[in-house]
Curated annotation (Swiss-Prot):
GO terms for biological process: ubiquinone biosynthetic process. Its EC number is 4.1.1.130. This is Ubiquinone biosynthesis protein COQ4, mitochondrial. It is a peripheral membrane protein.
Length: 277
């Protein structure tokens, strides 16, 4: 059952419409870094960041802006209510933990047993050459609690990568974003599927045949991953957690790509040899 606080704020349309303003009388920020936007500004931000991120998928700032601009006035409130309806989700909202290098000791994570959640996470970070301090701070979501929900989603994203094993290459990111869309319904994650157009032909084929069915099936069937208190799961067996969440590990994308490159190289060498003789 939702709390009275949740019921008071469940109607985001009423709250947004009741606080109209213009660029000339912009209200004070609701939290550090907050930038209040008019409806027109939010629409322009959504369109501009969508086009920019499609042109250059490596622009994390544009992807972050797109996520915030399209999350309101409904979707981020819905995800917040998903957390409020779950005991662990409510604890996360109450404690507001943050995932970064100051709150998670990399040395400690590397000392854990190989198949634990924490070790799987840090091994994935090392393999992909990324760290926990790369997530931009939320700016464009007005409600302070909903801004935290978006921040929490961002900071947990690499844990989703780790337990699925999907790499940060475009093919892996699109597969994970599709899973996230089925699980969270955040529009930005669904819009990321348009990036499939930029993939190579063989990568597109793998996405439609392998990654899309896996992402939709697991995203819909698994528990809400936003409600996982990752900081409390670090020493737990990762296979056990996957089973509890209802997440099947997808095919090893890096291994598939490695095999495909090897086969392509062998075919090219065979063609050169045949041409020579």
């Amino acid at each position: 059952m939702l709390t009275k606080r949740a019921l008071r704020t469940t109607d985001p349309y009423r709250r947004v419409l009741s606080r109209g303003f213009s660029v000339l009388n912009r209200p004070s920020p609701n939290y550090p870094g907050h930038v209040p936007l008019t409806t027109l500004e939010r629409g322009a931000l959504a369109v501009g960041s969508a086009i920019g991120s499609l042109i250059n998928p490596r622009r994390a700032d544009l992807i972050a802006a797109l996520g915030e601009a399209t999350a309101t006035p409904y979707f981020i409130y819905r995800l917040r209510d998903v957390m409020l309806s779950d005991p662990t989700g409510r604890r996360i909202l109450r404690n507001k933990p943050s995932i970064n290098s100051k709150t998670l000791s990399v040395e400690y994570l590397r000392s854990l047993s190989p198949n634990t959640v924490g070790r799987t996470y840090v091994d994935w970070l090392d393999r992909e050459g990324v760290g926990p301090d790369t997530r931009a701070k939320v700016q464009y979501i007005d409600d302070k609690e909903c801004a935290y929900v978006m921040q929490r989603y961002r900071e947990c994203h690499d844990f989703y990568h780790a337990i699925t094993g999907l790499p940060v290459v475009a093919e892996g990111e699109i597969a994970l974003k599709t899973f996230e869309f089925a699980n969270t319904l955040l529009p930005m994650t669904g819009l990321s599927m348009f990036a499939v157009m930029r993939l190579k032909p063989e990568e597109k084929e793998r996405f439609w045949k392998l990654h899309l069915p896996w992402a939709v099936r697991n995203g819909l069937a698994s528990k809400a991953v936003i409600n996982v208190y990752w900081e409390e799961q670090l020493e737990r067996d990762v296979d056990e957690l996957r089973k509890e969440l209802g997440i099947e590990k997808p095919v090893d994308l890096r291994e598939i790509r490695k095999i495909m490159r090897r086969q392509k190289k062998m075919a090219e060498e065979a063609a050169k040899t045949k041409k020579r003789y």
